[in-house]
From Swiss-Prot:
This is Doublesex- and mab-3-related transcription factor 1. The lineage of its organism: Eukaryota, Metazoa, Chordata, Craniata, Vertebrata. GO terms for molecular function: DNA-binding transcription factor activity, RNA polymerase II-specific; metal ion binding; RNA polymerase II cis-regulatory region sequence-specific DNA binding. Testis-specific. Localizes to Sertoli cells. Keywords: Activator, DNA-binding, Metal-binding, Nucleus, Repressor, Transcription, Transcription regulation, Zinc. Belongs to the DMRT family. It comes from Oryzias latipes. Residues 27-74 bind DNA. InterPro entries: DM_DNA-bd, DM_DNA-bd_sf, DMRT, DMRT1-like. Its main location: nucleus. Gene3D superfamilies: DM DNA-binding domain. The keyword Chaperone does not apply.
């Protein structure tokens, strides 16, 4: 009997019961309204496909979220197949990235592979050694995540970094726009407000003390035209003649000298030639 018992196979588990048929997906909209209908080929002919009740709205929202998740998974799988997601190895020099947790711990990375530099603090070194010896894969995973977060492309910084001097130049431009337009030096010439500049240095520092203000007097176009007309060559020839003026002066002097000589007295006024000879 013992031999027969030893020869019989012993069942490993309990006797299998009646096998269930695989679960068929059912239409959730029909289930909300108390009907059971298989989902295969039923979406087009569902009686409640356009229902707007609260339960059907919730189901529609869930379906949209699930469709978005499926599309995202497909896109990630395609990018992994094409190798877009994997970071490319940089052929340039080493990049030194400062660790945010420890200020004096630097990581030198070259592409994907990188080893943390030896920290100066012996306690932190012992702690890092024990952590790496206990779970090297976890430490490598954390380090890779930190590296990917800290390393960004230079084009990202060049494109998204705001300008340093935008606010300064914007304030200057607004200041020149707010200046009144009648501040120009010439009243006839109106200068645009964005081209008007003001001096940052006081004018009294380089002007003589007799002058009260560095601003020149205002001129108008009428004064300018009048001055130009008075200094024109036509007006000089029409109003003045230097030779006529000299002849009239010399004739007056000669007449006065002759009158004094005829009266018998000495002249009180000497000619210009005698005065120049005496001084010599």
């Amino acid at each position: 009997m013992s031999k027969e018992k030893q020869g019989r196979p012993v069942p490993e588990g309990p006797a299998p019961g009646p096998q269930r048929s695989p679960r068929m997906p059912k239409c959730s909209r029909c289930r909300n309204h108390g009907f059971v209908s298989p989902l295969k080929g039923h979406k087009r002919f569902c009686r409640w496909k356009d229902c707007r009740c609260a339960k059907c709205k919730l189901i529609a929202e869930r379906q949209r979220v699930m469709a978005a998740q499926v599309a995202l998974r497909r896109q990630q799988a395609q990018e992994e197949e094409l190798g877009i997601c994997s970071p490319e190895a940089s052929s340039g020099p080493e990049v030194m990235v400062k660790n945010e947790a420890g200020a004096d711990c630097l990581f030198s990375m070259e592409g994907r592979s990188g080893t943390p530099a030896v920290p100066p603090n012996p306690l932190s070194a012992a702690g890092s050694c024990s952590a790496s010896s206990s779970s090297p894969s976890a430490a490598a995973r954390v380090y890779g995540e930190e590296a990917s977060d800290l390393l960004l492309e230079t084009s990202y910084y060049n494109f998204y970094q705001p300008s340093r001097y935008s606010s300064y130049y914007g304030n200057l431009y607004q200041q020149y726009q707010q200046m009144p337009p009648s501040d120009g030096r010439l009243s006839g010439h109106s200068m645009p407000s964005q081209y008007r500049m003001h001096s940052f240095y006081p004018g009294t520092a380089y002007l003589p003390q007799g002058l009260g203000s560095p601003v020149p007097p205002y001129f108008s176009l009428e004064d300018n035209d009048g001055a130009a007309a008075s200094f024109s060559p036509s007006s000089l020839t029409s109003t003045h003649d230097s030779t006529l003026t000299c002849r009239s002066i010399s004739s007056l002097v000669n007449v006065g000298v002759k009158a004094e000589f005829e009266s018998g007295g000495q002249p009180s006024v000497f000619p210009a030639d005698s005065m120049s000879s005496e001084t010599k």
